[in-house]
Amino acid sequence: MNMEEDTQSKEIVVAPKKEKKVFRPARSVIKGVPAEIEKDPKLQKAIEVLPSNYNFEIPKTIWRVKQANAKHVALQFPEGLLLFATSIADIIETWTEAETTIMGDVTYGACCVDDFTARAVGADFMVHYGHSCLVPIDQTGSIPCLYVFVDIQFDTVHLIDTIKSVFPSTVPLALVSIIQFVSSLQKMAQDLKSCGYTVCVPQCRPLSPGEVLGCTSPPVPEGHTIVCLGDGRFHLESIMISNPEVPTYLYNPYSKVLSREYYDQPLMKKIRKEIIDKASTAKKWGLILGTLGRQGNTKVMENLKNQLEAAGKDFVIVLLSEIFPAKLEAMSDVEAWVQVACPRLSIDWGASFPRPLLNPYEATVALKHAEWHAQRYPMDFYANESLGEWTPNHKPPCPCGQTRNTGCKGLRCPSSKQGSNKD
């Protein structure tokens, strides 16, 4: 081989490598927080005004604000964390060049992330505290949004010891919690497994493993017993409704009390079915789109509009941030309401309204577009694998008849590709 041939062969070998580099998909790399921020002694001293077992991710927040070159940061807290709002705002303003605005409107959950108001007040960056990233950051418009779950550390040893004293190792357990305690579930599961227990941490995507929302809960394997970590019944009732035959216990990390909990499923279903049946005969409907943060979902609303039109129903659309009986009573000509805001509003308080107030699933049943699930009321509002078009993330079933959980490969599924081919 002469020199020219050798040079050509080397060029041929090198060329593919260059081509790969050119066409490799670009990736967004999030670097760690710089040490000068993470280890800043003055910053650490300032953080001491906050509870030591609450992780507000202050260094990460400061770094993200600096990265975004933000000048105006909107801070959104749930009611239980508002008492820390001014301290956090002071820290952010001290260690960045941004001013802050605390958004004090009521925030019930992750669905209430209010990027609309943040933009309206001129903010160019937003931090939402206390909830998971239910509304993807690519859907919060033109404003960057950082979700801070606020992990809360608690005495996990006490819970494990309590479980060991109450349940024999022959009882399979399912551990779930609100987002603040989710980070502790996997470690506790491993500790219990090492003691001979069968433990699972169920997941309902896109939620984190073990996470429970008031409107979305994972299915629990048959024969298990649920241990739910939290300090109230709202999230607890969600997983109880979703798993009506499963014994459920609530552990309050603050009071360190483990209690057996009950929910009157037959009564709830009886009341809701009677209201659904009453609404099915209504001629004029009111369709409420919730405007509290991102509660209202236009995709779900459009599906309901189509169903109402197909049924020949007269209807009016109303925008409301919060829904009260007196507000709806003022529109006395409306015979039935359906609210696209919080599904639990109808379940928990619907009987307090003088006229039927349905959630999207119940309205779909009333309009004959879905079956009534008498055994298991759906708690799947934000689930990727939801049961019907009454949910924001619902996707029509693949021609293969399976879901991603049972083997479907989504866009890569041969059946999906075949079904999408044009003649």
Swiss-Prot record:
Cofactor(s) demanded: [4Fe-4S] cluster
Pfam families in UniProt: Diphthamide_syn (PF01866)
Origin species: Penaeus vannamei
Protein EC: 2.5.1.108
Cofactor info, note text: Binds 1 [4Fe-4S] cluster per subunit. The cluster is coordinated with 3 cysteines and an exchangeable S-adenosyl-L-methionine.
Subunit structure: Component of the 2-(3-amino-3-carboxypropyl)histidine synthase complex composed of DPH1, DPH2, DPH3 and a NADH-dependent reductase. Interacts with white spot syndrome virus E3 ubiquitin-protein ligase WSSV222.
Keywords (A to Z) from UniProt: Apoptosis, Iron, Iron-sulfur, Metal-binding, S-adenosyl-L-methionine, Transferase, Ubl conjugation
PTM info: Polyubiquitinated by white spot syndrome virus E3 ubiquitin-protein ligase WSSV222. This targets the protein for rapid degradation via the ubiquitin system.
Job description of the protein: Catalyzes the first step of diphthamide biosynthesis, a post-translational modification of histidine which occurs in elongation factor 2. DPH1 and DPH2 transfer a 3-amino-3-carboxypropyl (ACP) group from S-adenosyl-L-methionine (SAM) to a histidine residue, the reaction is assisted by a reduction system comprising DPH3 and a NADH-dependent reductase.
MF terms in GO: 2-(3-amino-3-carboxypropyl)histidine synthase activity; 4 iron, 4 sulfur cluster binding; metal ion binding
TM helices/strands, residue ranges: none
GO biological process assignments: apoptotic process; protein histidyl modification to diphthamide
Annotated metabolic or biological route of this protein: Protein modification; peptidyl-diphthamide biosynthesis
Family as reported in the entry's similarity comment: Belongs to the DPH1/DPH2 family. DPH1 subfamily.
Name this polypeptide is given: 2-(3-amino-3-carboxypropyl)histidine synthase subunit 1
Catalysed reactions listed for this entry: L-histidyl-[translation elongation factor 2] + S-adenosyl-L-methionine = 2-[(3S)-amino-3-carboxypropyl]-L-histidyl-[translation elongation factor 2] + S-methyl-5'-thioadenosine + H(+)
GO cellular component: 2-(3-amino-3-carboxypropyl)histidine synthase complex
EC class (word): transferase
Positions with a binding annotation for [4Fe-4S] cluster: 111, 215, 342
PANTHER family xrefs: 2-(3-AMINO-3-CARBOXYPROPYL)HISTIDINE SYNTHASE SUBUNIT 1, DIPHTHAMIDE BIOSYNTHESIS PROTEIN
